């Protein structure tokens, strides 16, 4: 695998959280069916583990390798950690609403607007966060880390996901 392929793998794994919000937004526009209940359960499950994995990837694998290499990058890493903490409540809100729909799909009618608002809020926060990461953290990964370090990050990220699949 080339260094560019490894960089792409790391970046793609860091950006996978975007897919979660699209699922939550689509859920708000569904009919009350068994498939909708299953989608709500799926979104709840994914929010419960994908976004925390994203934070763990950055906090455990990325930050540990970038800290101390550049003062501007150190400040960006501090901001990134703060943003992760600020995502906890919006994620919990989406997860709770999806669980409520998964338990009783007929509640979707009553929760539709709240779910859409929660998903929209989470999307806006994630987009700001990911825009920041794409402008500050990801370029630092590419600029400051060697190929073997990027490979180690990608391996750690995959291992976190494999432990969930097991």
Name the predicted role of every residue range.
Residues 1-166:
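Small-residue-biased structural context
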């Amino acid at each position: 695998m080339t260094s560019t392929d490894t960089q792409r793998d790391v970046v793609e794994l860091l950006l996978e959280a975007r897919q979660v919000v699209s699922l939550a937004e689509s859920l708000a526009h569904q009919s009350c069916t068994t498939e909708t209940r299953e989608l709500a359960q799926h979104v709840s499950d994914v929010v419960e583990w994908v976004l925390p994995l994203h934070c763990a990837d950055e906090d455990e694998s990325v930050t540990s390798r970038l800290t101390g290499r550049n003062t501007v990058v150190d400040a960006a890493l501090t901001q990134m950690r703060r943003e992760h903490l600020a995502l906890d409540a919006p994620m919990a809100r989406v997860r709770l609403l999806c669980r409520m729909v998964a338990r009783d799909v007929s509640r979707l009618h009553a929760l539709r607007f709240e779910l859409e608002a929660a998903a929209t809020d989470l999307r806006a926060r994630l987009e700001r966060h990911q825009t920041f990461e794409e402008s500050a953290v990801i370029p630092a990964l590419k600029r400051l880390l060697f190929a073997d370090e990027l490979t180690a990050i990608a391996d750690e990220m995959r291992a976190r996901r494999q432990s969930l699949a097991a």
